[in-house]
């Protein structure tokens, strides 16, 4: 992100695109903290990275950063047909524009937004100890506040964040794990 801003004409806004020779470089449109991307022919990639004084990302570090920002880096297919885009933080990730276009689920998404009915949201979770299992419930003081949807190295859960029993600083329990959000 910082390196991108050193280029001529670069702007500090997600998705902003500049051109290097004929190839685009752009800040990740979901979150500028994910850095910039260069779309280029593989044959020119390493020479261009060297000339621009850039480096490719370490995949594990990138996945960890994505997870910490609430962006699902892996196992996205586990969310299919389980959530609305607005529950997956698509609005915050610049994936929903309420001013234009038609898309699948538009009516439900607009209704949720308009009536302020968004009560659950996808959150990254961290395992303190134990083991997670996809589909299991998450509890705070015996009250269910969510469900584990992704149980991999970068786990996510659908959390009822407006529930009075949800405190983002608290530790929560599943059947076999202690977690935090």
Residue ranges and their predicted role:
Residues 11-13, 18-24, 94-106, 152:
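Hydrophobic transmembrane alpha-helix bundles
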Residues 1-69, 139-140:
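Acidic, low-complexity central loop/insert segments
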Residues 86-96, 106, 110-181:
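Glycine-rich, small/acidic residue-mixed loop/short-helix segments
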Residues 36, 64, 75, 81, ...:
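Conserved active-site beta-strand-loop modules that form the wall/rim of enzyme catalytic pockets
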Residues 58-60, 65-90:
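Short, conserved active-site entrance elements at the starts or edges of catalytic domains
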Residues 48-51, 78-79, 136, 168-170:
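Short, charged, solvent-exposed linker or helix-capping segments at domain edges/interfaces
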Residues 22-40, 81-101:
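The conserved catalytic core of RNA pseudouridine synthases
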